[in-house]
């Protein structure tokens, strides 16, 4: 995990916000991935995602970042997300069955200390591997009390609310949203969004995310990996500005 400060300028942020404003009608619904432990407050509808299309200003910004931090890498997949539900523990399915290393970068578009990404050290091939692992981990002692210091209510074990899955995972770090900053981590690391839904002043949360590396045909860029949501649209013939 690495936090990169000021990777986006104020002008870059406005480009992404305008990209969403102009094209949000092309966004698709992202549902809850299979295999995520059934915590409290987890719903099927997580967010709406708008793919960042080539030959746009938004794409050029991301392409320059990839070329700077991953020289020689020729593939990335980016999207603008408007989240309506705090994402529970998961890994990014872009890395499922990956032939080589893959990375995720999350970009903050706003200053908001109540918005956080919490990254743990454990690695999984896909979300379907998480629940059986956690069932075994819960048989042993917890290794932290992070659920007492961070907003992680949605990761509580619904069968026993005194237990929180995150307390059985090894923390790597916490990324607090500051406009223009980003966090880089292994796509297959388990991570979670802080439970911002508990604060009534927030109806949604915006971010930009990219995945970098050579993906497997089994990754979620293929429509079969979107669970309980809409298929990813083919943007080839869609006029996006």
Regions of interest found by a model, annotated:
Residues 191-197:
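Short, Lys/Arg- and Gly-enriched loop/turn segments at beta-strand edges
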Residues 2-11, 15, 216-221, 226-241:
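Peripheral, non-catalytic segments flanking oxidoreductase cores
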Residues 83-182, 188, 200-234:
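Catalytic core of non-heme Fe(II) oxygenases with the double-stranded beta-helix
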Residues 1-72, 77, 84-89, 117:
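Non-heme Fe(II)/2-oxoglutarate
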Residues 27-28, 191, 219:
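Secondary-structure transition/capping residues
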């Amino acid at each position: 995990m690495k936090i990169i400060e000021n990777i986006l300028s104020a002008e870059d942020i406005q480009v992404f916000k305008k990209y969403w404003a102009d094209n949000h009608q092309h966004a698709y619904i992202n549902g809850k991935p299979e295999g995520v432990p059934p915590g409290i407050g987890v719903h099927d509808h997580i967010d709406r995602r708008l793919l960042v299309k080539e030959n746009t200003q938004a794409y050029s910004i991301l392409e320059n970042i990839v070329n700077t931090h991953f020289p020689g890498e020729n593939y990335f997949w980016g999207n603008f997300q408007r989240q309506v539900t705090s994402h529970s523990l998961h890994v990014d399915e872009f890395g499922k069955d990956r032939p080589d290393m893959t990375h995720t970068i999350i970009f903050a578009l706003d200053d908001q200390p109540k918005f956080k990404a919490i990254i743990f050290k454990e690695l999984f091939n896909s979300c379907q591997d998480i629940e059986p692992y956690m069932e075994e981990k819960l048989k042993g002692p917890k290794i932290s009390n992070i659920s007492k210091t961070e907003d992680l209510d949605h990761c509580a074990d619904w069968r026993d609310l005194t237990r929180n899955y995150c307390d059985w995972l090894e923390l790597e770090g916490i990324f607090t949203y500051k406009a223009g900053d980003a966090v880089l981590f292994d796509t297959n690391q388990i991570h979670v969004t802080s439970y911002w839904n508990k604060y009534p002043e927030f109806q949604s949360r915006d971010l930009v995310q990219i995945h970098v590396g050579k993906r497997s045909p089994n990754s979620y860029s293929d429509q079969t990996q979107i669970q309980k949501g809409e298929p990813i649209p083919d943007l080839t013939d869609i006029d996006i500005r």
